[in-house]
Amino acid sequence: MQRPGPFSTLYGRVLAPLPGRAGGAASGGGGNNWGLSGSHVQLPGRAHSETRGDKGGSSAGGPAPSTMSKAEEAKKLASHTAVENHVKNNQVLGIGSGSTIVHAVQRIAERVKQENLDLICIPTSFQARQLILQYGLTLSDLDQHPEIDLAIDGADEVDAELNLIKGGGGCLTQEKIVAGYASRFIVIADFRKDSKNLGDRWHKGIPIEVIPMAYVPVSRAVAQKFGGEVELRMAVNKAGPVVTDNGNFILDWKFDRVHKWSEVNTAIKMTPGVVDTGLFINMAERVYFGMQDGSVNVREKPF
């Protein structure tokens, strides 16, 4: 019997068409310059019309439709390859968030029907929960299944050491929880997400989930200590900031140089008011990149 998920009391089994990602949002513009040396903090201003995360959307100056079509095909190819290689019967699966994971869930559902697989799925967001329900998969949570066999998720950027930036869709904390309690964490992405260094291709910053009352002091602390710009992420289809599934705000830290990411991640997480960061350091075991030529490039964690 399927156990109701954590959102059942508030939302019920809502099977409406899925959004491309939870809490679609844009970076906040305008605001005050705090005058910090070598850095500044953006307070919320008018929201830009900019699609975030790995959804592949863009503003008027974005990629041509042909490029986007190739990227979508690449996502699908990477997702299906990862599912074929790693999903097995009697597993507890962590289901990530975003547009790439849609292809993975579709293939998982096909295999469940074709092979009569017995799988249990743990969502990383409201969007992931609805996706699991839409495709008729078995929904559960960490209360019932605290040990996860395999987590599959996308990424906004992957560096040469398989460090990740995640959280463009605002689900970073629950994504990190699920990945952290999984025996194996596999990432699926398209060719645009493959970088030598974090920040080479992803220019929207590292997301930081914060308690709402602390967003200003956290913004100042991060900018003062590490430089760059810190912005409160503003919503597109609502007035005010993006609110996560956990009821928190998101800051986007646009760093201006390469850092020792493990040290930076620890330091930011120790800042009072910070819930977690979108830096996934030393967590991914393998990344599947769908390429423009129809191939899949598989990179494993260096030892």
From Swiss-Prot:
Name the keywords, alphabetized: Isomerase, Methylation, Phosphoprotein
Which residues are annotated with the PTM Omega-N-methylarginine?
A: R52
Q: Where is this region: Disordered?
A: 22-75
PANTHER family membership? RIBOSE-5-PHOSPHATE ISOMERASE
Q: What is this protein called?
A: Ribose-5-phosphate isomerase
Q: Which Pfam families does this chain map to?
A: Rib_5-P_isom_A
What are the coiled-coil residue ranges? none
Q: Which NCBIfam families match?
A: PRK00702.1, rpiA
What InterPro entries does this protein's entry cite?
A: NagB/RpiA_transferase-like, Ribose5P_isomerase_typA_subgr, Ribose5P_isomerase_type_A
CDD domains given in the database record: RPI_A
According to its UniProt entry, this protein's organism is Mus musculus (Mouse)
Q: What class of enzyme is it?
A: isomerase
Query: Molecular function terms in GO for this entry?
Result: identical protein binding; monosaccharide binding; ribose-5-phosphate isomerase activity
